[in-house]
A protein has these predicted regions:
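Active-site anion-handling motifs in enzyme catalytic cores
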Residues: 1-358
Length: 358
């Protein structure tokens, strides 16, 4: 089949581009002709020009992500900047199926209806979601918008979501059945990333702690972790998450703020310990069998990581705060990855079955 993926491939965000890459590769393994639907936000060009003009750091980051996009997230459709353009031209692409997801593609109040595939004619193209997320734990009622989204979702052939709360929203708010699947990045094991994105990078055994902290807690946690690691003769690196983060944040010594997608992955692979409140950083800590702690992200989005940790029986790796007890646990209580891999294997097979039976 000719399949189009509708997601945040354009975002300067490691998780966004990696989940797109992972889903694309898995669908290609299953024998499909896979394209990225190049739907871009209208504001993208304006912001990009402004940041290029005033921020060298942004330019470096943009170049890194642009390289990944042009090298790995291909082929793409023509560029679409509006619903009007999609409605006028998308039918000419002649897709058999469009898959929306993964990531928080169903945050309707920010993104509108395109990610509910309002521009796709169901008579000619099947609509499916894979690991879509609403970006909220409960639906915020909005009258006519809720009705319109319900009508759009009823046109989907199959619906799958990433969080348990998403299953509930689909059932109780929109009256549709949704299946729970894993994030696309976990459809592959560590060896896949080592053979594709990390084949030119060295694997080391340095005693090192890596952290990736989102939001306003960043600076305090960074200093605390840096001091804690120094006292234990551990190297310490702080990874930023998106270009927006490094444009606004103050950095601790040793921060990496314009590394490539592969370099970001390699930092996690080469770490001994990982501390994060980022979902995808936690995902790769698990895939690379790292000792890790996930902190509560007070800006939201905790449902996705709690769903995953519960499924893998790793609830003890989640903490609402950062203190010495948590960090000592990180060092002294090895994660039983043999058992984790067995549970992950079951989840992976279930999610692959969803894709194989589309």
């Amino acid at each position: 089949m000719k399949i189009g993926i509708m997601t945040f491939h354009w975002a300067q965000n490691y998780g966004a581009v990696l989940q797109c890459y992972a889903l694309k590769c898995k669908l290609e393994e299953l024998g499909h002709d896979v394209w990225i639907i190049d739907r871009l936000p209208r504001y993208e060009g304006i912001l990009r020009r402004l940041y290029h003009r005033f921020s060298y750091k942004y330019f470096l980051s943009w170049m890194r992500f642009a390289h990944f996009n042009h090298s790995f997230l291909v082929p793409k459709t023509r560029k679409y900047h509006s619903t009007k353009e999609l409605e006028k031209h998308f039918g000419k692409e002649k897709f058999d199926m469009v898959i929306v997801g993964s990531d928080q593609v169903w945050r309707w109040n920010i993104l509108g209806y395109n990610y509910f595939l309002d521009f796709v004619d169901k008579r000619y193209t099947r609509k499916v979601s894979y690991a879509a997320s609403f970006g909220m734990s409960h639906w915020e009622e909005n009258g006519l918008d809720t009705f319109k989204i319900a009508e759009l979702l009823k046109e989907f052939s199959r619906v799958s979501v990433r969080e348990q709360t998403g299953v509930g929203i689909c059932q109780h708010t929109f009256g549709i059945h949704a299946e729970l699947v894993i994030d696309p990045t976990m459809l592959h094991d560590a060896s896949f990333y080592e053979k594709t994105l990390l084949k030119e990078y060295e694997k080391t055994d340095e005693a090192k702690m890596v952290s990736c902290i989102l939001g306003k807690e960043h600076k305090g946690h960074c200093l605390q972790l840096s001091n804690w690691a120094w006292k234990r003769s551990l190297a310490y690196e702080e990874l930023y998450w998106t270009s927006w983060d490094f444009f606004h944040m103050e950095f601790c010594k040793g921060s990496f703020y314009h590394i490539s997608v592969s370099e970001w992955l390699n930092e996690i692979r080469n770490a001994s310990y990982v501390v994060t409140n980022s979902f995808h950083c936690a995902v790769f800590a698990i895939l690379f069998h790292k000792q890790f702690v996930v902190l509560n992200n007070h800006s939201g989005g905790g449902d996705r990581i709690r769903t995953l940790l519960t499924a893998l029986h790793l609830e003890d790796c989640f903490s609402s705060s950062l203190d010495d007890r948590i960090l000592s646990q990180l060092l002294h209580e090895p994660i039983p990855y043999e058992k984790v891999e067995k549970r992950l294997g079951v989840l992976r097979e279930s999610s692959l079955a969803f894709l194989k039976t589309l």
